[in-house]
């Protein structure tokens, strides 16, 4: 409702003042004019020292971010990490950012090798310390890595959002199987009693 944006006029002699409040998320393009009772219009306002007084954006809503790997889609900051993504080759996580009002300023990521979820305060510290990298390609976890991908998107209004993937394990090393037969038989594979076979798997 535009009528709620403008306050009532306050008159002090020949000076009339009203306040216009832009408090809803939107891209604003507006103008101002005034005409007195004699039909005389005000001169054009000098705005040469102001950047964009008649065209600006109010955006108080954080942008959204999706991290995607195959059929897995993450769109929030997970509070609990479980390592449910397994692969024997590279795992490439794609980031897709969206903002309905402001343009996207940056998308960055941090590859975390721990096994507990990080909160927003911890992620802010990592970001401020330069631990996030600008995103310009799929984010990769290579064989031999255990990782959680943290994404960060920021718009030009300064709003930002963190999103995390679930735990990822990339492993291209084949497991090793061992057998141990007890008791040992120096005469070969024929026994006249019980045989215990211990099977071991190392991965």
Labelled PLM ranges:
Residues 1-203:
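Low-complexity, disordered linker/stalk regions enriched in Pro/Thr/Ser/Gly
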